[in-house]
Curated annotation (Swiss-Prot):
Protein role: Produces ATP from ADP in the presence of a proton gradient across the membrane. The alpha chain is a regulatory subunit.
Protein known as: ATP synthase subunit alpha
Disulphide-bonded residues: none
Family under the similarity heading: Belongs to the ATPase alpha/beta chains family.
Location(s), subcellular: Cell inner membrane
This protein's GO CC annotations: plasma membrane; proton-transporting ATP synthase complex
PANTHER family: ATP SYNTHASE SUBUNIT ALPHA, MITOCHONDRIAL
Amino acid sequence: MATTLNPSEISDLIKTRIEAVKLSAESRNEGSVTSVSDGIVRIFGLADVMQGEMIELPNNTFALALNLERDSVGAVVLGDYENLREGDVAKTTGRILEVPVGPELLGRVVNALGEPIDGKGPLGATQTAPVERVAPGVIWRKSVDQPVQTGYKSVDAMIPIGRGQRELVIGDRQTGKTALAIDAVINQKGTGIKCVYVAIGQKASTVANIVRKLEENGALAHTVVVAATASESAAMQYISPYAGCTMGEYFMDRGEDALIVYDDLSKQAVAYRQISLLLKRPPGREAYPGDVFYLHSRLLERAARVSEEYVEKFTNGAVTGKTGSLTALPIIETQAGDVSAFVPTNVISITDGQIFLETDLFNAGIRPAVNAGISVSRVGGAAQTKIIKKLSGGIRISLAQYRELAAFAQFASDLDEATRKQLERGQRVTELMKQKQYAPMSIANQALSIYAVNEGYLDEVPVNKLLAFEEGLHAHFANTQGELVSKINTTGGWDNDIEAAFKKGIEEFKTTGSW
């Protein structure tokens, strides 16, 4: 007599049989490419893949797993994808993306994967680190109280930057954003601060020009240049800031100071938007994906000043009593001065202040074109050098009063003496804040210029001769008070003796009339 099975028994039997089948590791860790388009590969059958994992493809090509769906994986190819075909085998690697780190990278130009592209041979780096890392926790951080000198009077006096700060440089195209950041890198020569310059989506010719300028000014030796140019894929432009940050963190973790420039994060957001739309992620405001804020916040939060305990723990006691820092200068390009667009507002809210560069000021010959009214440094004041902090208070006030009165003076024909003096002082302060590119100024020279204008020594100097006067004054002090100049540059201190020397030196120089 035939055995009859009821439906529930059949169901149980099938379940038991399925559970008894042991899938081999190979079948869980191997899949096949189902489609390749626009740098995105869809892979079927990778059951064990992790978010952000490296996937190995034929011809030594790798992809980054970004979308984990029910029965397929969406991954972005790192590099060329012309040789990939439907049906190609894809394998999991069990690793996330890592890049080379260490002092061997200084003086070199690398791509987003840390591969040298400057024709100077292999890097020789022995260590690697993952491009994505959780930012240091609150317990491991220290407050920002050491300065990063940019060499610009307007920035160091009014918008000071500290080690471990994130200071946004924002403005329209062609307003001098990159110039300001490159001069800040050049000014770190001899300070021990290591620099990382990340070029995102820029022309290769522009990057080559920047590298040449760094070399000419002796700054390439302490700098790593990470370049993901406009001709490279969106994936490379998306990961390049994280790769650069990892290279900078190497120095921070070991009790050293580093400065990183992201030029610029607007292009990274565009690259990420492109990848997200190709992966069929739902678009949000301005077609950016929902996590574009997290894209930048997780990057910029990695810039910090870490405590002695953090460094000691990280190095297993090899480095003691030293704090480390990574200072970030992200750059954002605005359209027609619109700082209320999606990405600019995001980055403004993440950073510790912003330097706003204005087209009108730039075209009027005021360079760097810093708008002192809406530029701010939220934490840098505590890090400012003592002498600059003491002297620079009058600068902001003079400029604010000048801007207010200048608008009013357009309609008034006869002005009283006090108003006229304020206007003239404001004109001189504005003129004095001008500075040539690739000519960062030392602390002593900045202090001297600020002191001279604050104390009224420049009131009789014609505005058009002001910069020549300043140049001559600096040369006079270098020749006659060399010891004092080097003392100020070393200590950054301020006392009555220095003030007396400043007064005497300025009066002496004015009597020579050699300007």
